[in-house]
Structure formats: C-alpha cells, structure tokens
C-alpha cells in the first residue's frame, strides 16, 4: 500500500483517459473538476475546506461582555448611591438582563445546542488528510487523476479515493465540473446513487472520498457479455429510473447517463456515479452542450433549451445499448452521428423483443414533450414483466423518495 500511496502523492506525469470510447465530446468528462480556486492563490483554496464560521460565535459573546463592563465602571455609581432608587432599578436590572440571556439561551434549547455541537464535531472530523487513509490498488485511471481502493485507518472503512490533479484541471479549464460533483453528489441519498462521503485537498491535488462499488462499471460487464438479456436490462432500467426520479425531484439533471458512469454495488445493484456534467438548475432549463456524443438528445445538438427530459432520451439510448451491444446512433464519423440523432434514425435488430422496442421508441422522440415520464417508464408492461429488483431495494427506493 505504501507504493500506491507514493504514486498517489507524486505529481501528475501522464494523463490516461478512463475509457477509450470513440464517441465523446472533446471536452473531457471522466472526472469532474474542482473549484476555480486552487493553485493561483493560497487563500482561494479555503473554499474547498469545511466552513470555519462557527468559531466566531464565542467572539460575539465576548463583545457583549466587553460592552457591559465599561457601563458598570462609569462614574455614575457615586451619585446613584445617594439616590437609592436609581442604582437599584436601572444599573442592576440592565446588568441582570444582559447577563441572564447568556446562560438561559443554551438551557432553553438544549437540543439545538447538542445538534450544533455535533455538527461542529462532524465538520472537524471531515477535515481529512491523506495520512488518514491506507491507499490500496488502483481502481481506474483518468485524464485528471486516478481512483484508488482505500481504507480509513481509524474505522477500517473501505472506500474509493479519487485523486485529481489541480494543474491538469486548470489547464483543461474544467474546474466547475468538480464543484458540481461536490455540491450535488454530496447532498444526494439514494441506494442507486454512489455516495460522496467527503473531500479534502492539498497544494497540488483534490481528493474525493467515494463509496466503493466492488463489482465495477457496467461498461466492463457489457464488454464481457457483448449484450444483456431482457431481465438484466429491465432491472437496470428500473433502478436507473428510480434514481433519476429522485434526482429530478431534487431538481438535478444528470445529462451524462452512459455505461461508463454506472457502477455496480456488492449486491449487483446499479449506482449512478460521476455527476460532473450534472446540474442543479432552479430554472430547470439549460442551453449548454455537454455529455457523451452517442447519448446527446436532439434538443442539445440543435442548441435548443432542454430540461430533465434529456435524461429520458439517454435512458432510451441506454436500454437499446444494453440489448444490442452498441448505441442506436453510432456511426463512423461525428457528423454522421449528429445527423442520425437530429433525424432520430435508428433500426432494431431481430434480437430486440417487441416490448422493448415499444419502450425505446417512446423514449427516443425528437420532441421532448412526447417522451414518457419516469413513472410511465416504471409502469411499462415490458419493464414490469422483466424487471427483478430485490424487495430491499424497492423499500429503500421508496423510503428515500418520500
């Protein structure tokens, strides 16, 4: 593990792409980027660290005490001593009123006090460093860094540590992607979404503490088997639709659903990873062009406004690829792929069953408003007949969405 740790600590020498898929947008997407904060100024790096604003609370209390003491030491006491009612009513009452709110405040809300202490303790615990982990074998390599199997020394918890190099992120100008991944993925809680436990950074690297998916990427499984059967495809589509439904309820659009960004947990359950291209859109409308070429919908290629329906299109492309072994609009050139997508030109081989053809055809509509909702996808007869998710996953999915 020491050798792997040295490799993790050493600076970037070569950038190796995570996958060799030919149909990618020129902008690199395998690893999201980091805040535009990093090497240029040391102060800006503090953006990635946990907030330290809670440390200022006691300083405010000290200011109240410092204001009260000079009031008590004013030379008004001798004249007030002669007149008994004045010193008794005003100065003591003011000091008592000012001193009393401080002790009772925490006493009146003990639960809030305990909760704030717990949050402070958690924030301190989340100030991770590389020395807190034992670094194991590499799990994957990408253009901006690597992913390693790791173990937290104190708890012995197994996780995945994604190491990204700041210099390469800044050179590519994709720092905003890392900010998206941290801001979005850290707040998502769903059994079919990969957890982001925390993050930290040093002078040259950014580290993401991620949930470990022991069965690897769906893309590798698809390469081994060439294609999936109906049951496995329908099960994956069900789990993916549940996860996307949760994301959309949080006003999060993923925009880059593809086999490389889907991992498998210990029980074989599907987990969405890599939220670098995702976006939390209060307006739910985006015009930027991003995502993997084969999965881009017509509205994004044509530069039109788009919403969460882009994920429905990707779901149809993914269902087709699972059953056939390749995307429906795959072509020899980018120009031909763009043309096929904009015209929605694709054909079904004989191996695709009729029920799956109906679902895919409904999802791959040029007009986004004509695509079914995720609820309608889950209620599709072919999905119901072939999907075999575990009862445990169903309970977790419904509890997370409620």
From Swiss-Prot:
The modification Phosphothreonine is found at residues 287-288. One of its GO terms (cellular component) is centrosome. It comes from Bos taurus. Pfam families: Pkinase. The lineage of its organism: Eukaryota, Metazoa, Chordata, Craniata, Vertebrata. Belongs to the protein kinase superfamily. Ser/Thr protein kinase family. Aurora subfamily. Residues 30-75, 91-100 have a biased composition (Polar residues). Residues 110-126 have a biased composition (Basic and acidic residues). InterPro entries: Aur-like, AURKA, Kinase-like_dom_sf, Prot_kinase_dom, Protein_kinase_ATP_BS, Ser/Thr_kinase_AS. ATP binds at residues 143, 162, 210-213, 260-261, 274. Keywords: ATP-binding, Cell cycle, Cell division, Cell membrane, Cell projection, Cilium, Cilium biogenesis/degradation, Cytoplasm, Cytoskeleton, Isopeptide bond, Kinase, Membrane, Microtubule, Mitosis, Nucleotide-binding, Phosphoprotein, Proto-oncogene, Serine/threonine-protein kinase, Transferase, Ubl conjugation. Part of a complex composed of NEDD9, AURKA and CTTN; within the complex NEDD9 acts as a scaffold protein and is required for complex formation. Identified in a complex with AUNIP and NIN. Interacts with FBXL7. Interacts with CPEB1, JTB, TACC1, TPX2, PPP2CA, as well as with the protein phosphatase type 1 (PP1) isoforms PPP1CA, PPP1CB and PPP1CC. Also interacts with its substrates ARHGEF2, BORA, KIF2A, PARD3, and p53/TP53. Interaction with BORA promotes phosphorylation of PLK1. Interacts with CIMAP3. Interacts with GADD45A, competing with its oligomerization. Residues 1-126 are annotated as: Disordered. Activated by phosphorylation at Thr-288; this brings about a change in the conformation of the activation segment. Phosphorylation at Thr-288 varies during the cell cycle and is highest during M phase. Autophosphorylated at Thr-288 upon TPX2 binding. Thr-288 can be phosphorylated by several kinases, including PAK and PKA. Protein phosphatase type 1 (PP1) binds AURKA and inhibits its activity by dephosphorylating Thr-288 during mitosis. Phosphorylation at Ser-342 decreases the kinase activity. Residues 133-383 form the Protein kinase domain. Mitotic serine/threonine kinase that contributes to the regulation of cell cycle progression. Associates with the centrosome and the spindle microtubules during mitosis and plays a critical role in various mitotic events including the establishment of mitotic spindle, centrosome duplication, centrosome separation as well as maturation, chromosomal alignment, spindle assembly checkpoint, and cytokinesis. Required for normal spindle positioning during mitosis and for the localization of NUMA1 and DCTN1 to the cell cortex during metaphase. Required for initial activation of CDK1 at centrosomes. This is Aurora kinase A. GO terms for molecular function: ATP binding; protein kinase activity; protein serine kinase activity; protein serine/threonine kinase activity. There is a cross-link at residue 258 (Glycyl lysine isopeptide (Lys-Gly) (interchain with G-Cter in SUMO2)). It catalyses: L-seryl-[protein] + ATP = O-phospho-L-seryl-[protein] + ADP + H(+); L-threonyl-[protein] + ATP = O-phospho-L-threonyl-[protein] + ADP + H(+). Residues 280-293 are annotated as: Activation segment. The active site is at residue 256. It comes from the Eukaryota. Activation of CDK1, appears to be an upstream event of AURKA activation. Phosphatase inhibitor-2 (PPP1R2) and TPX2 act also as activators. Inactivated by the G2 checkpoint. Inhibited by GADD45A and p53/TP53, and through dephosphorylation by protein phosphatase type 1 (PP1). MLN8054 is also a potent and selective inhibitor. Activated during the early phase of cilia disassembly in the presence of CIMAP3. Inhibited by the small molecule inhibitor VX-680. The modification Phosphoserine is found at residues 41, 342. Its EC number is 2.7.11.1. It is an enzyme of class 2 (transferase). SUPFAM superfamilies: Protein kinase-like (PK-like).
